[in-house]
Each structure stands twice: as structure tokens, then as C-alpha cells.
């Protein structure tokens, strides 16, 4: 597998909608920056027989609205960008180093299969012990790296994936 570089990512964004909306200034030497979307799912109170239905509380943020992530809190968020990974590529999401230095952590589900289309759900937590983090729709949250596969898989996520075409922050489907 070989990683794509700036001009290859730019060409795929323009020709096949690899990442939309596409802004050329988001291109890095071997990745493209993505921004935080406007839907956040936070943990609700879990007690009683309705616990499974009330686990998540949805927050639909306006573009200028902030979400305060308290120390130790866990949320599901999503990228503003819609990603279309061709079947001959794979992708990985990584948090921007600036976000990590602030105490934000993205948990381990950063792999994006060949053939996936949709917004990327992000599993975020504040690892600070004392300080809140402010999240805002549109802020640069991470970057996507793309790798070219040596062969095209016999199965595509487009046919087998349970999170295909998702939009917004999506909890586990099992």
C-alpha cells in the first residue's frame, strides 16, 4: 500500500468527490483536513428499563454555537465532510495534533474501509483532569490519510457495511 500525496488527493476530490465540500486550503502534504459537524451525541442518564433507548442525548448545534466537553466526558460527533472512498483505496482518520495537545482524544475507530461513503462518526473524549474543551462546528478536528491498495477487494463496504451513507453522529449498530 502506498499513501496518496497532496496532488493525488486534490485530483480525486475534484474528479470524484473524494471529500465534499472540498476546499483546496485543507490539503496537507499527505492528508486532507476535515472539520467538526453540527450534531453531537452525549451520554444521557442510564437507569431503569428505558436505559437502552435514552443512552444518547442529541445536540444539534448552530454554526456559531459551542459545545463544552467536560473532563472525562465521552461523545459521538461527526465530520462536516462527506467522504467517498473508492474501492481501490482505504482511509484513516487522525486527530489534528493541535486538538490532541488541548487534551482531546479520538478513540480507536479511525479506519475507513474501501467503498465507504458517508460522514465519519468520531468517538471523542476529554482526557484533561480539570479543564473543559470547547468544540465548535466547522473547527478543524482531524485529517484523513488515503492509501492505495495493491489489489481491489472482492467485497466492497458499499455492499456489506452497516454504516454506509451515514450522516451525522451514529451510535453503534451492534
What are these regions (language model features)?
Residues 1-174:
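DUTPase catalytic domain/fold
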Amino acid at each position: 500500500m502506498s499513501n496518496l500525496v497532496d496532488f493525488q488527493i486534490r485530483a480525486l476530490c475534484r474528479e470524484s468527490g473524494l471529500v465534499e465540500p472540498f476546499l483546496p486550503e485543507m490539503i496537507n502534504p499527505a492528508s486532507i483536513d476535515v472539520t467538526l459537524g453540527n450534531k453531537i451525541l452525549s451520554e444521557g442518564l442510564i437507569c431503569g428499563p428505558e436505559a437502552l433507548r435514552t443512552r444518547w442525548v442529541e445536540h444539534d448545534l448552530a454554526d456559531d454555537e459551542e459545545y463544552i466537553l467536560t473532563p472525562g466526558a465521552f461523545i459521538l460527533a461527526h465530520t462536516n465532510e462527506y467522504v467517498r472512498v473508492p474501492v481501490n483505496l482505504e482511509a484513516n482518520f487522525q486527530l489534528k495534533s493541535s486538538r490532541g495537545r488541548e487534551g482531546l482524544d479520538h478513540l480507536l475507530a479511525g479506519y475507513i474501509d474501501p467503498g465507504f461513503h458517508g460522514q465519519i462518526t468520531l468517538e471523542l473524549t476529554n482526557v484533561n483532569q480539570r479543564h473543559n474543551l470547547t468544540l465548535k462546528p466547522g473547527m478543524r478536528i482531524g485529517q484523513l490519510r488515503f492509501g492505495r491498495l495493491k489489489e481491489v477487494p472482492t467485497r466492497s463496504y458499499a455492499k456489506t457495511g452497516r454504516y454506509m451513507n451515514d450522516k451525522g453522529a451514529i451510535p453503534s449498530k451492534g
